[in-house]
Design a protein with these regions (language model features):
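Short, Lys/Arg-enriched N-terminal segments with co-localized hydrophobic residues
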Residues: 25-43
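Serine residues within intrinsically disordered or low-complexity segments
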Residues: 6, 13-14, 18, 42
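Conserved short alpha-helical segments that host acidic/polar catalytic motifs at enzyme active sites
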Residues: 38-266
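Intrinsic-disorder-associated, low-complexity terminal segments enriched in Asp/Asn/His/Tyr and depleted
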Residues: 9-10, 19, 25-28
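Residue-identity detector for glycine
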Residues: 15, 21, 31-33
Length: 266
């Protein structure tokens, strides 16, 4: 099942182009913390992703991965936002089993190296999703026997001084009768490009109706403040249309550009 919603590009406006793609895809056949002498289970509260997005005018690019509430689907979502005409002049198009970005109006394309890439690629029964061309890095390294984490050791944050935008990535990998997923962020050391901080978060056998959300920025600003902490726990519903529509409607109307959602039968 696929659905695309587009808003016509208006050259007299700020250049906002919105596009939303949705498809259903069949796969090819807590921490425990110590506090003094007391052991306590660290419980991350589940946030309302819709309220989270509504309260943040500019989360940048974001990835959601999890399991549908009925336990039948692995779910992933990816969105992009933009403030400049160049960043807003993009749509998602299908590319094999994945997607790639493309300039809506090629005549307005300025610097493609950070905005034109494949956010989603499928390698066998694994699905990769990222906010940049590290999708290809992960694909190529894993094709040659390396792991998700090993492949990302060859990359770092983006070179968009002074923001040094984090590279965020995720992967869904099947296991016996289910799946695992991982998320990664590569970021500067509080805005200092002399150090790259690499974090990987792995989730084995996710629970029904639960997922995690990671994005590039804490909000708007100059420079843009990088995401902090670990991916946020969120609820994942059963209905792809409901999930897509509410995500899209929760993103800031002036800054949202494109959204892609996929439910994978498990």
């Amino acid at each position: 099942m696929a659905k695309v919603i587009s808003r016509p590009y208006n050259p007299k406006s700020s250049g906002l182009q919105s596009h939303m793609g949705v498809c259903r895809h069949k796969r090819n056949k807590v921490g425990i913390g110590l506090l003094l002498q007391l052991k306590r289970r660290s419980i991350m509260k589940k946030i309302d992703i819709y309220e989270e997005l509504k309260s943040n005018d500019y989360p940048g690019r974001g990835i959601v991965i999890g399991k549908s509430a009925d336990g039948k689907s692995a779910v992933k979502a990816y969105f992009i936002m933009g403030r400049s005409v160049n960043s807003r002049n993009r749509v998602f198009i299908e590319d094999g089993d994945g997607i790639r970005t493309q300039a809506f109006d090629p005549s307005k394309l300025e610097d493609p190296h950070l905005i034109i890439y494949a956010p989603v690629r499928v390698l066998g029964d694994k699905t990769i999703v990222t906010n940049g061309d590290q999708t290809d890095t992960i694909y190529e390294h894993m094709e040659n026997g390396q792991t998700f984490e090993q492949s990302l050791r060859t990359r770092e944050f983006e070179d968009d001084d002074p923001n040094f935008t984090p590279r965020i990535s995720g992967i869904i990998e099947p296991n016996k009768g289910g799946f695992d997923y991982s998320m990664s962020i590569l970021k500067s050391a509080d805005g200092n490009p002399q150090s790259c901080q690499r974090y990987t978060f792995s989730y084995n056998n996710p629970l029904d109706g639960e997922g995690h959300f990671i994005h590039t920025y804490m909000g708007d600003g100059s420079p843009l403040p990088s995401f902090e902490g670990e991916p946020k726990k969120v609820a994942i519903p059963n209905d792809i249309n409901e999930f897509t529509d509410v995500l899209w409607n929760s993103l800031n109307a002036d800054n949202k550009v494109s959204l892609f959602v996929r439910f994978i039968d498990i």
